[in-house]
């Protein structure tokens, strides 16, 4: 996997990389791709550290504050960095809502990438039972599986929303999250969307969290 990834990246001859993950993994990539590169080629929290600060000190700032500093240091506009708003991506999903007859709903994202199963919380069906026993028909419990998650969604006791048998696209998904009453998600993309459209919710970080 790593060999093919590195070969693919090298093929494009990128002149600059903005590393916003700032993890040990992406630092490993840097050491393979651009071992001697400074911030002119590889922009990361490590290469753009403010004078007199070490990385552990710098990492005490919020993620968005670190992003702002890193991007500003590379000469990019950061007007919206501290106030990310993804609402612009939402599209009209009234037809889908009408088809499934949903108005008030709690949205679950029990899925994760196949290679990151450690992020998966295994108690969603128990949670659905608790929600149903407390709220009855007041809220529908739904999920929105991605293209590779449609089959897996059958194991979750929630209504799986699709668009004519296909997974919702990013704009439809954003609208669904935005209009939800509450979101419960693993640490995946939809959780980040929820945070940036102002949705109420909870992110679960693996199976160590009990129901």
Segments the model singles out, each with a brief description of its role:
Residues 1-211:
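Catalytic machinery of carbohydrate-active enzymes
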């Amino acid at each position: 996997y790593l060999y093919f990834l590195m070969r693919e990246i090298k093929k494009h001859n990128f002149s600059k990389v903005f590393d916003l993950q700032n993890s040990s993994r992406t630092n490993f990539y840097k050491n393979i791709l651009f071992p001697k590169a400074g911030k002119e080629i590889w922009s990361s929290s490590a290469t753009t550290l403010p004078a007199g600060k070490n990385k552990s000190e710098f990492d005490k700032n919020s993620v968005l504050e670190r992003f702002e500093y890193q991007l500003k240091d590379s000469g990019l506009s950061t007007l919206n960095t501290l106030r990310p708003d993804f609402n612009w991506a939402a599209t009209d999903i009234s037809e889908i809502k009408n088809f499934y007859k949903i108005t008030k709903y709690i949205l679950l994202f029990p899925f994760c990438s196949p290679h990151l199963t450690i992020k998966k919380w295994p108690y969603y069906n128990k949670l659905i039972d608790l929600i149903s026993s407390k709220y009855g028909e007041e809220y529908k419990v739904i999920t929105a599986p991605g293209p590779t998650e449609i089959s897996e969604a059958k194991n979750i006791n929630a209504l799986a929303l699709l668009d004519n048998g296909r997974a919702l696209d990013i704009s439809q998904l954003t609208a669904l999250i935005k209009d939800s009453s509450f979101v419960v998600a693993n640490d995946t993309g939809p959780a980040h969307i929820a945070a940036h459209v102002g949705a109420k919710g909870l992110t679960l970080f693996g199976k160590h969290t009990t129901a």
